[in-house]
């Protein structure tokens, strides 16, 4: 039989445990940024592009729970990586269009030697977000591609419209490209179904927040994807295409993260013939 003292001790321990988890998931982890460094093998990558770096930021969700100061911190961390390119993979605000101008202003401080590129997410107003970012020198790609040159060598940077809120068209996006390497920005990883049959080499996606809440030994109980937790976060190989799903830096629905730290990813491109 459990004594009154044992019951009280157990109850107090339970309450303290719940409070500790709550404090961690609400106050600590949502601001505890993880920086990942990942090498990506690209078939037939021109020699002049070997070692090119791309920093990815995703799912900023600027709102009262993701304030400007935190975005400033993320921008400083990206700039400290000295990337050649910055890729922004959608969902810049959450809940209100009033935050569009301020997130664009903060992102205008990003420094990249060869450009800052973006695609839209399902929370982004197309016209207002595209206009605000373009005004700050950020190129928004909507079912289109551009060549990126280093002397006579080049590859393609492409971006698609959002799978849910837009009109994603991979055929239009790639129309007119040749057999040179293709790097694709895409908000929703579910779009890999449409992409994996193309000759896109590398896809950067977001959207999932890594589930935002992950349970030890189980993983994320909820992921907003038709595939469940299959593409929750990390590196995936689909046919000849490599896809990386970034956990993002913001939050949605609830201002918490648990075992799904906000993430900035730095990719280094190398020829697929080179050792990893």
PLM-predicted stretches and their roles:
Residues 42-54, 146-157, 238-242:
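Beta-strand-turn-beta hairpins that frame and shape the catalytic cleft
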Residues 29-80, 96-99:
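N-terminal signal-anchor transmembrane helix
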Residues 128-131, 135-138, 142-144, 150-186, ...:
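Binuclear metal-dependent hydrolase catalytic cores centered on His/Asp/Glu-rich metal-binding motifs
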Residues 61, 93, 123-124, 145, ...:
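Catalytic metal-binding/acid-base residues of hydrolase active sites
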Residues 189-268, 273-274:
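Conserved beta-sheet core of the metallophosphoesterase superfamily
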Residues 63-149:
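Core catalytic region of metal-dependent phosphoesterases/phosphodiesterases
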Residues 1-18:
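N-terminal secretory signal peptides and thylakoid transit peptides that target proteins
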Residues 57-58, 86-90, 115-122, 141, ...:
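Active-site neighborhood of phospho(di)ester-bond hydrolases with catalytic His/Asp-centered motifs
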């Amino acid at each position: 039989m459990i004594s009154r003292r044992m019951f009280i001790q157990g109850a107090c321990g339970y309450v303290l445990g719940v409070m500790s988890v709550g404090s961690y998931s609400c106050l600590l982890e949502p601001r505890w940024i993880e920086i990942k460094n990942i090498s990506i093998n690209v078939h037939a990558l021109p020699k002049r592009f070997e070692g090119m770096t791309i920093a990815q930021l995703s799912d900023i969700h600027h709102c009262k729970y993701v304030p400007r100061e935190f975005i400033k911190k993320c921008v400083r961390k990206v700039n400290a990586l000295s990337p050649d390119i910055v890729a922004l993979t959608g969902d810049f605000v959450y809940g209100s269009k009033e935050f569009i101008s301020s997130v664009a202003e903060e992102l205008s401080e990003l420094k990249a030697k060869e450009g800052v590129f973006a695609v839209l997410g399902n929370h982004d107003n197309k016209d207002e977000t595209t206009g605000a970012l373009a005004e700050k020198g950020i190129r928004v790609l909507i079912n289109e591609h551009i060549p990126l040159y280093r002397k006579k060598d080049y590859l393609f940077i492409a971006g698609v419209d959002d799978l849910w809120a837009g009109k994603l068209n991979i055929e239009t996006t790639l129309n007119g490209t040749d057999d040179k390497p293709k790097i694709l920005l895409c908000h929703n990883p579910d779009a890999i179904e449409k992409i994996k049959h193309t000759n896109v080499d590398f896809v950067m996606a977001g959207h999932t927040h890594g589930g935002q809440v992950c349970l030890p030994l189980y993983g994320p109980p909820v992921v907003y994807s038709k595939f469940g937790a299959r593409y929750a976060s990390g590196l995936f190989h689909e046919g000849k295409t490599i896809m990386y799903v970034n956990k993002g830096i913001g939050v949605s629905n609830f201002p918490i993260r648990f075992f799904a730290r906000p993430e900035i990813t730095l990719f280094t491109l190398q020829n697929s013939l080179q050792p990893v």
